[in-house]
């Protein structure tokens, strides 16, 4: 979970967008500009990143769920891999409208996906005609692509982690309606509004995206481990010897 300013520099976290595309609401997090590119103040980014990771760790220690969201080409693989490593749901292809606000409908699609997966696992698909099998296979692939990352998400997540808030305005709007905290990477060309835990920085570099996502996954795993350790300690502490009077 620990990240240094040098690691942020090496990942290019400090590189913002062209100055002409800037969002004035990001002014407090901008150090200056070089060659018409805004430079993010990494002293602020590091502190805000650490605050966000602290929150995620605490949430995870209380068995909270964090939904990873990153559908940009350079983010997809990393988001899926790090979410899977942390045992968390993710959206890596396309944000479907209503994924949070209309989760009942999404659950119907998840149920259908699991039914199709069961057909494959128990061999039932092989008993169908070629035409039917092909139709079901296409349906399964389509559902896997759109909701495969959230098929084990039992309900609304406790928080969402978003790479590139401008690219995922729909997700942030839905989270706001439901009061779900957003941990978001916000570049110099976007607004930080609606983001509870802002991580000011580059949202285009694959190295930077890896740094953020790996940090979130590490924080989740650390939180889960600390909760397990606390449970073990509490069990040990309550394991006092009690003498039983057999004559009673």
Swiss-Prot record:
The name on file for this protein is Small ribosomal subunit protein uS2
What the entry lists under SUPFAM superfamilies is as follows: Ribosomal protein S2
Does the record bear Iron-sulfur in its keywords?
A: no
Origin, by domain of life? Bacteria
> What are the recorded GO MF terms, alphabetically?
structural constituent of ribosome
Q: Does the keyword Transcription apply?
A: no
Q: Which gene encodes it?
A: rpsB
Gene3D superfamilies reported for this sequence: Glucose-6-phosphate isomerase like protein, domain 1 (3.40.50.10490), Helix hairpin bin (1.10.287.610)
GO biological-process terms attached to the record: translation
Q: What is the lineage of its organism?
A: Bacteria, Pseudomonadati, Pseudomonadota, Betaproteobacteria, Burkholderiales
Q: Which keywords does the record carry?
A: Ribonucleoprotein, Ribosomal protein
**InterPro entries the UniProt entry points to:** Ribosomal_uS2, Ribosomal_uS2_bac/mit/plastid, Ribosomal_uS2_CS, Ribosomal_uS2_flav_dom_sf
Q: Which GO terms describe its cellular component?
A: cytosolic small ribosomal subunit
Output the CDD domains linked to this UniProt entry.
RPS2
The record's similarity note reads:
Belongs to the universal ribosomal protein uS2 family.
